[in-house]
Swiss-Prot record:
The chain crosses the membrane at residues 26-49, 58-79, 101-120, 140-158, 196-219, 236-258, 270-289. This is Olfactory receptor 4K1. Residues 1-25, 80-100, 159-195, 259-269 are extracellular. The keyword Disulfide bond applies. InterPro entries: GPCR_Rhodpsn, GPCR_Rhodpsn_7TM, Olfact_rcpt, Olfactory_Receptors. Disulfide bonds join 97-189. It comes from the Eukaryota. GO terms for molecular function: G protein-coupled receptor activity; olfactory receptor activity. Keywords: Cell membrane, Disulfide bond, G-protein coupled receptor, Glycoprotein, Membrane, Olfaction, Receptor, Sensory transduction, Transducer, Transmembrane, Transmembrane helix. SUPFAM superfamilies: Family A G protein-coupled receptor-like. The gene is OR4K1. It is found in: Cell membrane. The keyword Transmembrane helix applies. Glycans are attached at residue 5.
Length: 311
């Protein structure tokens, strides 16, 4: 390992969500359903958008990339958590812990930026509809996605750069089901005040700036929708409602953990479940239930397969 001689810890012990065997079985059943539904739902969205020509638009291109991020985010810690429910001593190697930190912050940072890109797409579609096809071309969408991934990776690397070489000489118990960055930093055998400030500044900057950008964007869009005729605004309002719901449910716990990362309460580990396990499920549920185009494409795909089986 590439850390100092003081760093004697080679693995971390994850305390998980509960020591009760009954609760662990209950959590296993619930989170297994959530995990499978999340992965299959997001895969279904990608498949539908890829094969339905009516969904060949910038909004759905960005949505398919959001689904891909959610699939990746579903797999960074949830499978291990499900296995750990049946293991008495839940451990993770130092390298595995650092990998979890890197993957989580990469995907979270990327998703934040992608949500901003989707808000911009809706702004152009509703407030400047005549220029939509000119502005929101394929090249710009690829640039948006590339920037989202670049920001996510840089955000994660900036965290990992000062975490990987911290001296960990014990204790090594992380009071969560995954390696949460603030909890890991607190285990370092040194004064971590400056590290905590750096984490707060880094995470707070990206989360608050993205959230404020989204709030401003959707406020302008809602004003634009209200100024339009009622007949032309219902579909736009339905799409906006789905987007705003995703933003609120995603950024709510996200800002809580990012702005107050080192002030921990017993309920925090259960909020982290929503943040890491349930958030990837929001995309397929909200977009499939509230988006008429996606629902129509789902039924079309279903009927196509049913007819092919009959023939």
């Amino acid at each position: 390992m590439a850390h100092t001689n003081e760093s004697m810890v080679s693995e971390f012990v994850l305390l998980g969500l509960s020591n009760s065997w009954g609760l662990q079985l209950f959590f296993f059943a619930i989170f297994s359903i959530v995990y499978v539904t999340s992965v299959l739902g997001n895969v279904l969205i990608i498949v539908i958008i890829s094969f339905d020509s009516h969904l060949n638009s910038p909004m759905y291109f960005l949505l398919s990339n959001l689904s891909f991020i959610d699939i990746c985010q579903s797999n960074f810690a949830t499978p291990k958590m499900l296995v750990d429910f049946f293991i008495e001593r839940k451990t993770i190697s130092f390298e595995g812990c650092m990998a979890q930190i890197f993957v989580l912050h990469s995907f979270v940072g990327s998703e934040m930026m992608l949500l901003v890109a989707m808000a911009y797409d809706r702004f152009i579609a509703i407030c400047k509809p005549l220029h939509y096809s000119t502005i929101m071309n394929r090249r710009l969408c690829v640039i948006f996605v590339s920037i989202s991934w670049a920001v996510g990776v840089l955000h994660s690397v900036s965290h990992l750069a000062f975490t990987v070489d911290l001296p960990f000489c014990g204790p090594n118990e992380v009071d969560s089901f995954f390696c949460d960055l603030p909890l890991v930093i607190e285990l370092a055998c040194m004064d971590t005040y400056e590290m905590e400030i750096m984490t707060l500044t880094n995470s707070g900057l990206i989360s608050l700036s993205c959230f404020l950008a989204l709030i401003i964007s959707y406020t302008i869009i809602l004003i634009g929708v209200r100024c339009r005729s009622s007949s032309g605004s219902s579909k736009a309002l339905s799409t906006l409602t789905a987007h705003i719901t995703v933003v609120i449910l995603f950024f709510g716990p996200c800002i809580y953990f990012y702005i107050w990362p080192f002030s921990r309460l017993p309920v925090d580990k259960f909020l982290s479940v929503f943040y890491t396990v349930c958030t990837p499920l929001l995309n397929p549920i909200i977009y499939s239930l509230r988006n008429e185009d996606v629902k129509a494409a789902m039924w079309k795909l279903r009927n196509r397969h049913v007819n092919s089986w009959k023939n």
